[in-house]
Amino acid sequence: MSSRGSGANAASRQSMTASGGAVKARQLAHLHSQLTQLSHNLATTENLMRMTAVQAEAMRGLGSWHAGLFMAASKVLGEESVQNQQGN
């Protein structure tokens, strides 16, 4: 009987080893898939960061332009209010 039990044990170990190898292969395939997706997401993030940097520089220029317009409008409106006060 003990030889029969040993044979069953050995077969069980072999099937566990085989199934363990299949599990490991499946896990490695899943890991590879996740790493591929991560690499793609990082490339997308890098492109978005580049675009954001370009847009931030454009917004800086736009902000300077608007500041100039506000200063010019303030000067014109300030002169008009001074003239109105002198006229009264």
From Swiss-Prot:
Subcellular localization: Nucleus; Cytoplasm, Cytoskeleton, Spindle; Chromosome, Centromere, Kinetochore
Residue ranges, compositional bias (Low complexity): 1-15
Stretch list, region Disordered: 1-24
Keywords (A to Z) from UniProt: Centromere, Chromosome, Cytoplasm, Cytoskeleton, Kinetochore, Nucleus
Pfam families the UniProt entry points to: DASH_Hsk3
Keyword Nucleus: yes
Keyword Nucleus attached: yes
Predominant place of localization: nucleus
GO CC entries: cytoplasm; DASH complex; kinetochore; mitotic spindle
GO molecular function annotations of the record: microtubule plus-end binding
GO biological process, one term: attachment of mitotic spindle microtubules to kinetochore
InterPro entries: Hsk3, Hsk3-like
Self-association and partners: Component of the DASH complex consisting of ASK1, DAD1, DAD2, DAD3, DAD4, DAM1, DUO1, HSK3, SPC19 and SPC34, with a stoichiometry of one copy of each subunit per complex. Multiple DASH complexes oligomerize to form a ring that encircles spindle microtubules and organizes the rod-like NDC80 complexes of the outer kinetochore. DASH complex oligomerization strengthens microtubule attachments. On cytoplasmic microtubules, DASH complexes appear to form patches instead of rings.
Function: Component of the DASH complex that connects microtubules with kinetochores and couples microtubule depolymerisation to chromosome movement; it is involved in retrieving kinetochores to the spindle poles before their re-orientation on the spindle in early mitosis and allows microtubule depolymerization to pull chromosomes apart and resist detachment during anaphase.
Record-stated family: Belongs to the DASH complex HSK3 family.
Protein name, per record: DASH complex subunit HSK3
Organism: Chaetomium thermophilum (strain DSM 1495 / CBS 144.50 / IMI 039719) (Thermochaetoides thermophila)
Lineage: Eukaryota, Fungi, Dikarya, Ascomycota, Pezizomycotina
Gene: HSK3
